[in-house]
């Protein structure tokens, strides 16, 4: 983030009681995501040049919508707030119980919106470096595309709605998978 200019950040604790996430070791992804979101908000609120909003501050969904519409609503909220970025918090699950580490899901360089792909990858790299300083293993970046949906330039669209809608709305949007609920540690 450029420290010279004030920033508006929308934090998105992924999932909710209606659109539940992964389960493992007595943990519910939507609850862990909310705890991470609140901690991040509290940390960022220390900076006078950063304005922080959250898509939810309790277990309720953003709106009473089906999942795809709910995800799109999160990006539309970022657009209404003129957010500089949208960061969605998640926790992974894997059948391999020992798998660990954080991963960033970001826009690939489709050529459709270079600013968004470049910015999300830079922001993701910075976030991952901070997570590594906390002792969390990096699983790197994950780029995934849709086979049947394309951007206006003909490039395959990003798979994850949060990321894809960010590209379409010109708002750098990424997903952080902070670890695995399937791993006891």
Regions found by a protein language model. Give the residues of each.
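Non-catalytic propeptide/linker segments at domain boundaries
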Residues: 1-7
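Conserved beta-strand elements of the Class I
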Residues: 9-10, 174
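Glycine-rich N-terminal loop/short-helix segment of MobA-like nucleotidyltransferase
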Residues: 12-25, 183
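Glycine- and acidic-residue-enriched helix-capping/strand-helix junction motifs
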Residues: 21-35
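Active-site-proximal helix/loop segments of hydrolytic enzymes
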Residues: 34-185
């Amino acid at each position: 983030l450029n420290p010279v200019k004030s920033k508006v950040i929308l934090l998105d604790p992924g999932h909710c009681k209606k659109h539940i996430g992964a389960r493992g070791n007595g943990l519910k992804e939507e609850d862990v995501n909310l705890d991470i979101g609140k901690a991040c908000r509290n940390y960022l609120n220390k900076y006078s040049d950063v304005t922080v909003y959250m898509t939810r501050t309790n277990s309720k969904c953003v709106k009473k919508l089906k999942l795809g519409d709910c995800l799109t609503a999160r990006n539309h909220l970022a657009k209404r707030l003129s957010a500089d970025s949208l960061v969605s918090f998640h926790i992974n699950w894997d059948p391999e119980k020992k798998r660990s580490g954080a991963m960033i899901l970001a826009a690939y360089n489709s050529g459709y919106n270079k600013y968004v792909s470049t910015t999300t990858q830079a922001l993701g790299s910075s976030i991952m470096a901070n997570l590594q300083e906390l002792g969390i293993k990096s699983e790197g970046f994950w780029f995934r595309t849709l086979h049947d949906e394309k951007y206006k330039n003909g490039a395959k669209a990003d798979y994850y709605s949060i990321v894809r809608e960010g590209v379409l709305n010109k708002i750098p949007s990424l997903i952080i998978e902070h670890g695995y609920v399937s791993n006891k540690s």
